[in-house]
């Protein structure tokens, strides 16, 4: 990002933005469906987890839940989505997808 810019300019390129929207729909669609069916809070949990750089304690504090609950939710999110958020590339992909404009 340029000085004074809050976002990397390449993220707004049409092809990149479209790819991120598609990834967001795929990733969060699964979680939103689970949330609707089971009254969970997985989509919000993942968003907060990504916003806090994968830090469970900070995520738990932001959500007002115990860190073990946050850990359990992240484990279930990874299972539902078939992803491993401990992998830096996967984490980055999820992070950028979460920031995509819908």
Regions found by a protein language model. Name each.
Residues 1-102:
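Cytosolic nucleotide-utilizing catalytic cores of signal-transduction proteins
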């Amino acid at each position: 990002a340029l000085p004074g810019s809050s976002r990397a300019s390449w993220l707004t390129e049409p092809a990149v933005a479209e790819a991120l929207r598609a990834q967001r729909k795929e990733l969060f669609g699964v979680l939103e469906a689970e949330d609707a069916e089971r009254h969970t809070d997985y989509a919000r949990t993942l968003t907060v987890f990504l916003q806090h750089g994968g830090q469970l304690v900070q995520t738990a504090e932001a959500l007002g839940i115990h860190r073990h609950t946050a850990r359990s939710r992240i484990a279930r999110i990874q299972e539902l989505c078939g992803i491993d958020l401990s992998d830096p590339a996967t984490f980055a992909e999820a992070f950028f997808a979460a920031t995509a404009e819908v």
